[in-house]
Amino acid sequence: TMIIVPTDALRTQISNKVASLGLLSNSQFGLIKETVLKPIVGVMSHRPCSAEEAIAFMEQCNVVVTTISIIGSLSKPIQVAIANQCSHLFVDEAHHTPARSWSIVKDSFKNTKILQFTATPFRNDDKPIGGKIIFNYPLRKAQDEGYFKPINYIPIIEWNSKQSDQI
């Protein structure tokens, strides 16, 4: 299984959540036993030099998390070798998938089950994201359930140079 994210920060956040099983491991929910084995999560933080190196890395992991910039910079044969090691591909921030770099990578995984996540299901350029919507959490429902709080904006940068040393 591979998870592709757009940034290093998300790669770190997602890999930590997967490694710890996130909310699944919260004892108050009783979803899994404390003794359950946790997945071996690999963080692909550099480009493998060959398909063999990529495969060797993938074989040591249950889940690999990487960024689009890393996997997108690999040659097609290495991408396909990685895809052949994956039962599933999870794409975070999937509204980016119509972009050329993302669609090339996604094409390498065409024989893999792909699950895409996005909170931005519409693009300004009207390019379709593709796929079938299997879950939708409307903004109105999120607002009604209190997931949005009032924003108290405090600027970090003062544009008026006479006030730049004051808060």
Language-model features: locations:
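Conserved Walker A/P-loop ATP-binding site and its immediately adjacent core
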Residues: 1-29, 101
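Conserved nucleotide-binding/hydrolysis micro-motifs of P-loop NTPases
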Residues: 8-11, 69-72, 95-96, 120-124, ...
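Alpha-helical scaffold elements adjacent to nucleotide-binding pockets in ATP/GTP-utilizing enzyme cores
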Residues: 13-21, 85, 89, 101-105, ...
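Inter-Walker segment of RecA-like/P-loop motor cores
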Residues: 23-73
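Conserved acidic residues
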Residues: 62, 87, 112, 132-134
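SF2 helicase catalytic motif II
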Residues: 68-70, 79-116, 121
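Short regulatory helix/loop adjacent to the ATP-binding pocket of P-loop NTPases
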Residues: 123-135
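Conserved interdomain linker/interface between the two RecA-like ATPase lobes of SF2 helicase motors
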Residues: 133-167
